[in-house]
């Protein structure tokens, strides 16, 4: 793709998301979502082949359906309230329909089926945009309507998402699918706390984006797409492999790494609100996520691919790609937990 064209497309994606996040008029919010969706499709098809074409088509059909539901919710709310403003409380029916539309856009269970399929069919860089930037707009609207959202609906979807996100990733060997299922599980954690403490959901989103960006950056640096390709990494880049190991364990939510912080805070907040069964169920199902990340770390660092080369480091295959941006990302992805006392400000 022409660099100028690609830059314009990325600018449109950012503009669409910014419009959604800053607008106070429901019609403008809907237009922002449409701009964002239509601009991201060429990014998904950056490397043109039948697989990416299929992924982009699946993405378009899902997002178009979600946009239709979103517009239906906006119209129902307009009929009952006569207001276009996003600051006014939503009608209960409109709120349920809008929650379902946003769940479809986020890939929450039971609307999650498109996420692994689309992520698997596109490049790693496009997958990074899909699983990080594309979550910002729907989460921001969910944040705005959190006071009128149906709590039982959100909790049911969040428990299902955490369970499916863990269960679906167990037998996978494709890294993109594993990251997609991880994304479904993380979205489940975010929606569980959205009604009780929306600010904490945003904290979870920031940490999730940080961890996912770091993991994808390492995958892109080594062109890794399967668990088998991870076993080659130790010979080429041992330091980077160690960093990836820590980041993946952090994504799984293992203490004392950064990924444990949002889970800990969410479980604490839900328990404070006299909800014990929900956090207990989510904590148990989160172990599935941790298990498949432990499998990944095993294939990354504890297995060495058979080689006829006696040298421990393959110096002739030195990577020339820039890695300067990875240093702060890796530090933030693994060492945020000591800052947790500051987060009492959220309460």
UniProtKB/Swiss-Prot annotation:
* TM helices/strands, residue ranges: 1-21, 25-45, 59-79, 96-116, 122-142, 150-170, 201-221, 242-262, 274-294, 326-346
At the top level, the lineage of the source is Eukaryota
* Record bears the keyword Electron transport: yes
Name the enzyme group at the top EC level: translocase
InterPro entries named in the record = Complex_I_Subunit_2, NADH_DH_su2_C, NADH_UbQ_OxRdtase_chain2, ND/Mrp_TM
One GO cellular-component annotation of the UniProt record comes to: mitochondrial inner membrane
Where in the sequence is the signal peptide annotated?
none
Q: Name one GO molecular function term.
A: NADH dehydrogenase (ubiquinone) activity
**Any one GO biological process:** mitochondrial respiratory chain complex I assembly
Alphabetical UniProt keywords: Electron transport, Membrane, Mitochondrion, Mitochondrion inner membrane, NAD, Respiratory chain, Translocase, Transmembrane, Transmembrane helix, Transport, Ubiquinone
**Catalytic reaction list:** a ubiquinone + NADH + 5 H(+)(in) = a ubiquinol + NAD(+) + 4 H(+)(out)
Give compartment(s).
Mitochondrion inner membrane
SUBUNIT field: Core subunit of respiratory chain NADH dehydrogenase (Complex I) which is composed of 45 different subunits. Interacts with TMEM242.
Q: Which family does it belong to?
A: Belongs to the complex I subunit 2 family.
Please state what the protein is called: NADH-ubiquinone oxidoreductase chain 2
Q: What organism does the UniProt record list as the source?
A: Eidolon helvum (Straw-colored fruit bat)
């Amino acid at each position: 793709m022409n660099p100028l064209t690609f830059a314009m497309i990325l600018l449109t994606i950012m503009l669409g998301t910014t419009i959604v996040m800053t607008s106070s008029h429901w019609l403008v919010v809907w237009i922002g979502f449409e701009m964002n969706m239509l601009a991201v499709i060429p990014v998904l098809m950056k490397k043109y082949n039948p697989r990416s074409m299929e992924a982009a088509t699946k993405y378009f059909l899902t997002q178009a359906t979600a946009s239709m539901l979103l517009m239906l919710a906006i119209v129902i709310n307009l009929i009952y309230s006569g207001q276009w403003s996003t600051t006014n409380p939503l009608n209960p029916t409109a709120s349920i329909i809008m929650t379902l539309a946003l769940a479809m856009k986020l890939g929450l269970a039971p609307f999650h089926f498109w996420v692994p399929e689309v992520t698997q069919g596109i490049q790693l860089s496009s997958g990074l945009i899909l699983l990080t930037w594309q979550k910002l707009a729907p989460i921001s609207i969910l944040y705005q309507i959190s006071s009128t959202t149906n709590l039982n609906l959100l909790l049911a979807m969040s428990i299902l998402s955490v369970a499916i996100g863990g269960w679906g990733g167990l037998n996978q060997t494709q890294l993109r699918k594993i990251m997609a299922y991880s994304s479904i599980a993380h979205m489940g954690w975010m929606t569980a706390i959205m009604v009780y403490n929306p600010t904490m959901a945003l904290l979870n989103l920031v940490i999730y984006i940080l961890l996912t960006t770091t993991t994808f950056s390492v995958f892109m640096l080594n062109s890794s797409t399967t668990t088998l390709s991870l076993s080659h990494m130790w010979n080429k880049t041992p330091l980077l492999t160690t960093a990836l190991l820590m980041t993946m364990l952090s994504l799984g939510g293992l203490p004392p790494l950064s990924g444990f912080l949002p889970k800990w805070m969410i479980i604490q907040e839900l328990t404070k609100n006299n909800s014990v069964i929900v956090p207990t169920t989510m904590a148990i199902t989160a172990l599935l996520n941790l298990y498949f990340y432990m499998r990944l770390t095993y294939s990354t660092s504890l297995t060495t691919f058979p080689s006829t080369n006696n040298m421990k480091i393959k110096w002739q295959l030195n990577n020339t790609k820039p890695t300067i941006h990875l240093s702060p990302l890796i530090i933030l992805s693994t060492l945020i937990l000591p800052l947790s006392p500051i987060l009492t400000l959220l309460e």
